Structures are given as C-alpha cells and as structure tokens.
Amino acid sequence: MSNRIGPQRSTKTAAKLRLLPSTEEFDDFRRQDTGREVYSQIPQIEGSTAKRDAEHLGKRHREFLPRVTAYCTCDTFRVDLLFKFFQSRRSSHKTRPKQFDECIYSPYSYNNEETTDLLPDTLESSRGTLNRESSQESLQSIFEESGLDRNQPLFREVFCFTYGVVVLWGYTIDEEHRFLRELGRFEIEKLKIEDMEVEEFNYYITTLYQPRIFNDFIALRDASNYMIRLSISHAIAQSVKISLFEELVNETIDATKDTPQMIAETGRVNLKREEIMMAVGQLFILRININLQGSVLDSPELMWTEPQLEPIYTAARSYLEINQRVALLNQRVEVIGDLLSMLKEQITHTHDESLEWIVVILMGLLVLIALFSIVVDWKLFQ
C-alpha cells in the first residue's frame, strides 16, 4: 500500500536472529542480557533443528505462513469509539475487547477457521503442475526436517495502538484491507495511502526450540497466550511509527538540502520571505510532531504493570533496532534544528537589512528636506 522505502533497519535485508525468552526463562534472560551484541547468527543457534529451520525458511515461504502486519494509518484513533465498536461486534465477529493503556486488543474473526493448512491440495494451482509439486515437496521437506506442524493456528487478533498503528495477526491481505476500511471511521488525521507505513512478518508455532525472530519470521511456543503477542506487537507498532518519522525527516532533508549550499555560495538564501517562513513552519511542525509523539518510542506502561513481559518486548525491540534508529532519528532532527536556526537567522538578517535601508532612506529624506528648507530660506532672504 506504500511506495516508500520502509523501515530503515538492517534486519530487513540481513539474516539476523533474536531469541525470545519463554515464560520459564524470564529470570535467566534478565541475568544474561547485559548489553552484549543483541544478534546471534545462525551457527550460534543451539539445537540442529532450529539451525536447519533458520537456514530453510525464506521469502518464498511467506505466502504459506500466517501473516503479522502492522499499518500506520493516521496520527491517532478515537479510542473510546473504537472500543465501543469492538464491543458491538461480539456476536458477528467474536470480539472480546480489552484495553491496555495505549492499546486495544481483541479477537476479530471473519470466518470460523481456527487453523490453516500450510500444504493445501490446491497449493500454487495457478503456477502449473510442476511448480505446484516442487513447492509442495520443498515445503514438505522443511516440515519434516524442522518438525513444524503443517496445521498452524490462526489467531485473527487485532492490536490497535492510540498513536495510529494497528497490528494484525493471522489475516489474509484481503482481510487486512477489509479491516482497515472498517477502521477508517475512527482515524484522526488520516494518512494518504501512499504515505502509510507497513511492516510485514510471518509467524508459526513450534515447541522444538526457543521462541525467536529470524528474517522476519516469528517463532512462538505458546499459541494461547495473547499477552506474548501483545508484547511483540508493541515493538512492531513502535517500529512502524518510527518508519513514518524516518520518512518525514528524509523528505524534509531532501527538500531543504540545497539551502546550506546556497548560503555557502552566495552568503544568503535566495528565497522570498514568504518561502523562507513556509520552510521554517514545515521544519517546526516536524520537530513538534516528533517531540510530542516521542513518548511512543519509550517503553510502554504495560511493561511496568506486567514486568514478566518486558524481556520479550526488549528482545523484539532489539531485533527491530529501535534504540539505534531512535538515536539516528534524534541526530537527524538536530540537523533539522540547526537548519531551522540558520533560516531564522537569515530572516532576522534580512529584516535588519530592511530596517537599515529604511533608516538610510529616511535620513536621506531628512537631508533633502533640510536642503530644500535652506534653499527656500536663502531665496526669501535674497
């Protein structure tokens, strides 16, 4: 839905792994997570099954695994009305809404399916018999080697965050777009389709090894605990919101990158005062938006009330490189701040120049008036 660059994180293109602590490992995780390198490469994964799975699952398998997708669609939601909307769909869509500070959670079903078969008989029917059979054999070999259950549970869950992001688990692309249309009435300052930011993942359930995120595949052990998915969704939602900020900063820098060069070459900005004021206003609005919504980039309140979830959230946040991206974002905002100060100085300088010319002109007029008076007096005296 977007033509933008997308999340500026290395895990989008590089095969990196982040292990997720399971429930019984929370205490061990706190002792072990002491600031060392947050990623482990494939050869460091304990257990041959997990290693083989990490090597085999790739982009060509995404269409067969359940989806996890985050959309940044607006500035914020009408939270009260949205919660009432979910409450009104208990019978038709089997909703059970719950509110956690800045997030509304609810199941939201469009049909009665509770599992999905990753090897349906009609697999890839549109690609021809040979491709279909080779795809089935490839997937079947992965399931046999990794021990993945071909019948994966479909959660069909919605996590709506107050800062304009929704994370959807277990939906098809068509169902995601259908839900986004239903969500539209609750959006404030809705983004254009081309301005929306999207993060896409896939998930599967396995009990053979530790939960983890690798190559945007989320491996979970417990299918029944939605609080784990809430923790991961918090990190994903923050990541997609950061993507929006990154794109806004990039666009602003690209639009104003010629201004410093212009000043370096000519000593002034060859723009009209109105154009300079418009540029200053745009830069100022961007800084305000990032500063006002910067709280969404911090650890959510849920991690204080449910501290057992913090290790999972921290691990997902590390995989998404949120800390590094926020630091880089702040640096680029500082650059914008410097440019803002420079433009303000240019406006002040231009204004001072105008005042100086006004004073010069007035003094010239006074001199002319004085000379005229002298000439008139001299003629009268004659």
Swiss-Prot record:
The modification Phosphoserine is found at S135. The keyword Transmembrane applies. SUPFAM superfamilies: Cyclin-like. Its main location: nucleus. It is a single-pass membrane protein. Keywords: Meiosis, Membrane, Nucleus, Phosphoprotein, Sporulation, Transmembrane, Transmembrane helix. Coiled coil: none annotated. GO terms for biological process: meiotic cell cycle; mitochondrial gene expression; sporulation resulting in formation of a cellular spore. It is found in: Nucleus membrane. The chain crosses the membrane at residues 356-376. One of its GO terms (cellular component) is nuclear membrane. Pfam families: DUF155. It comes from the Eukaryota. Required for sporulation where it is believed to have a role in meiotic nuclear division. Belongs to the RMD1/sif2 family. Interacts with sad1. This is Sad1-interacting factor 2. It comes from Schizosaccharomyces pombe (strain 972 / ATCC 24843). The gene is sif2.
